[in-house]
Amino acid sequence: MHPVLCKAQNGLVAVLQEFRAYWISLLVLIVLAQQLPHLSAVLQAAGFGGALIVAAVISGWLATELFLRGPRIKSKGKAVLITGCDTGFGHRLAMRLAIREDFQVFAGCLQPDSDGAQRLRLIVTDDKLHVIPLDVTNAEQIQDALRYVKANLNGNQLWSVIANAGVNIFLEFEWIPIKDIEFLFDVNVMGVVRVSKTFLPLLRNSRGRLVLVASYAGRIASSSIVPYSMTKAAVIAMADGLRREMAKWGLHVATVEPFYYRTAINFNESQQDMMSRFRRDVPLQIQQEYGDYPAQAFQWILSCLRRVSRANVDEVVDQMVNAVTDREPKRHYRCDGFLNWLLSSALFVLPSVAQDIAVSFFEPNFRANEKSGLLLEIGAPSVTKIDDG
């Protein structure tokens, strides 16, 4: 077969495989609609074509997530490296892969003497889990980690690297000092780059998995997380491009893209902490021009986080495990629950103007006053700006 036709065939098979539950659901619903008069009447009343597609999407999603995970690879002879294991997703993933999935785990911790690192050592006491110091901004420490992994594989292959370490700062773009934006990129982007480039030769040899933890924020940016969204968009772009480059080696690259979850990265600051950071880092003139908006914005951020953040962080860990162990892996693993998945999927496909309108409904209603030049809440009395002197 011609190489182009061969690639087209493989691509079609991959699409059919990844979305098999949706095709099956659509076919089953069409057959049932012909056999069951009541179902046919309901679909016709709702608009047959549209209702059929919606029902297929819902049932396909449920089937994919709950029943059709497909075969998994065996963990025997395989090791994994995880960054950011001090707390959160990385900490729980390290325990899951070592204890339940029986992988050899190298758990990279920013602080190898932290409570989280000590807990890992206590829970997994044999040679199945190694806690190693790993600051993803430190190139020398990453090289040390590579040497340690090579020396302690004990006949295993490095099957997967999960680049999980990440940081976030909830501040609007104008308020964040350049040094903090550089730090976000150093951890979230360059940290992923450093770790990936260092361990790619081992992953190519094992024909394994490179798993990059991104975020839904990498697909649509909202207020107060613009630099964070920029970093996660870069990670998604890296995963898509690198996956295409590594396909010839049999190495798969995937992203895990969580929604908001109740972890330290989202709940590490109170409203008072945010205001203190704002007063410390933002020039006085800009503080005055923004008026009461920052206090309301911080209250809005925390209120939104409490309302939409999902409590079960094991949903994310489950998807991380799937990315490592699925025999037919996805390209992108979403962690959001059905309702959030449906809403965010709809938002992703809207044009930018519609996205702007949709997002604006959930933000504090402030506008700049033409006379004073100050940012005022809509409906608040106008203030005349008085120049000093």
Model regions and ranges:
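Canonical Rossmann dinucleotide-binding motif of NAD(H)/NADP(H)-dependent dehydrogenases/reductases
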Residues: 61-107
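The beta1-alpha1 cofactor-binding region of Rossmann-like NAD(H)/NADP(H)-dependent oxidoreductases
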Residues: 114, 134-147, 178
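Active-site Tyr-X3-Lys motif and surrounding loop/helix of classical short-chain dehydrogenase/reductase
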Residues: 144-148, 171-175, 179-186
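Conserved NAD(P)H cofactor-binding loop of Rossmann-fold oxidoreductase domains
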Residues: 164-169
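Active-site helix of classical SDR
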Residues: 196, 231-234
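Residue(s) in the substrate-gating loop at a strand-loop-helix junction
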Residues: 215
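C-terminal beta-strand-loop-alpha-helix "lid" module of Rossmann-like NAD(P)-dependent dehydrogenases
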Residues: 249-305
